[in-house]
Amino acid sequence: MTRTALITGASRGIGAAIACRLAAGGWDLTLAARTPEPLTVLADKLRAQYGVHVRTAPGDMAVEADVHDVARQHLTAYDGRLDALVLSAGMGQAGAIAGFPLSRLDKQYAVNLRAPFQLVQECLPALRATAALGPDEVTGVRHGARVVAVASITGMVAEPSLAAYAATKAALLSLCESVNVEESEAGVSACAVAPGYVDTDMTSWMHDRLAREDMITAEDVAEMVASVVALSRSAVVPSIAITRPGSRLWRA
C-alpha cells in the first residue's frame, strides 16, 4: 500500500520542497497551510507530474480547531494511515529579549510548538497503527512511522535577536526526543531537522549579509527528510543539523 504523509507549511519554501520530494517518491499526501490557493496549485502540479493522490487541508496552525481539522482530514482521507507527520509550518520574528513583545512570543509558541505538539498527540494512534503494519511490499523494509519536524540551528546555538524563535525551536527538538523515548520501541520515532539559513522567502532579509549561493536550499532540507523516512524502524535519528560552508555548530 502507498505510504502517506501529512505536511504542514506545505504551500511554499521548505514544506513545498518536501511535498515535491515525497511525491516524486510515490507518496500520497495531505498538504496543509493557512492559504488555500497555493496549496491547490501545488496539489494539482503534483498529481499531474507524479500521479499520486494529494489532498489539501487549509488551516491556521495558531488556531486549535484548525489544527484538529487538518489531522482529521488526513486520517479520514487515508483510512487512518499515516507513515510520516512532517511538521514544517513555522514563523519567526526577530527582536532583542529586552523589548520583545510577549504577544509575538505567544504567536510563535502557538505555531512553532503548540500546533506540532497537538498534531503529534492527535495523530499518535494512527502513527502507532501504521508502524505495526508489515514490511513494504516492494522493498521488504519495515519503516515504522515517523514524525519529522523542521527545527532550526538556532535551537542548538543561540543567535542575537532570535531568542523567542530559538526557544520554540529548541522546544521542538526536545519534543522529538520525548517522542523517541516514549514511542520508538513501538516503531514511532521522531527526527528534528535543524538547518541554518535556508534560502526561502522567510530569510530574504539575509540576502544583503549572506550570498544566496552560500545558503542552504529548501531542496537540501527536503532530501534529508526523504532520507529519514526511507530508514527502517530500527534506525532512530533524533536530530540532524545542517550548516552552511565554513560555519561552526558549536561555539568555543
Language-model regions: role of each:
Residues 11-12:
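Conserved glycine-rich cofactor-binding loop
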